[in-house]
Amino acid sequence: FQDTNALQFRWIKAIVSPASTTNSLFCVGDDDQSIYAFRGARVGNMADFVNDYHVKHLVKLEQNYRSTSHILDAANAVIANNAQRMGKNLWTEAGKGELIGIYGADDDREEARSLTQDILTLHRSGTPWRDCAVLYRNNAQSRIIEQYFTANSIPYRIYGGLRFFDRQEVKDVT
């Protein structure tokens, strides 16, 4: 529900009026995970739903089964700065896990250089290439990382897409 837009919320209201007493509407969403604002999504629809429909029973799924407490503590600390969130506190029984690190790069080249050096250091200390992974938000970010990996003989695979220089739009230009 966190990624619905204003029109979709109006449709819901047209189908089931907030004045209805049938309690026949159920909504699932996570106000901390709205990522489609660039497509018109309005996370405020969740709070509006709670207010407009006078929700009396709100179930918060706060236990996380995949992440460690170090990761969840960091996530809780970051998202706590959002004054418009509905509020929850994520927790786990998975243990503390490894400490997390944060690196602030000045630009994409510095980020790729640092990432490359970290992976080379891991590999030199015995970590197999297959145990290293890089996650990025969109495919355009892979270009500079691929350049650094290639220049440093780091083998890599792209899952869910093509290598930057194998993409048709890049081939047409070069």
Predicted regions and their residues:
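Generic alpha-helical secondary structure signal
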Residues: 27, 41-48, 70, 114, ...
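Active-site catalytic pocket residues across diverse enzymes, especially alpha/beta-hydrolases
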Residues: 15-19, 53, 149
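Conserved helicase NTPase motor core
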Residues: 1-48, 63-67
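Helicase P-loop NTPase motor core
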Residues: 54-57, 62-155, 168
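A cross-family signal for key residues in well-ordered alpha-helices
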Residues: 13, 47-50, 117, 174
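Short alpha-helix plus adjacent loop in nuclease-associated cores
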Residues: 32-37, 66-67, 158-174
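Short, glycine/charged-enriched secondary-structure capping and boundary segments
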Residues: 10-13, 40-44, 74-75, 147-151, ...
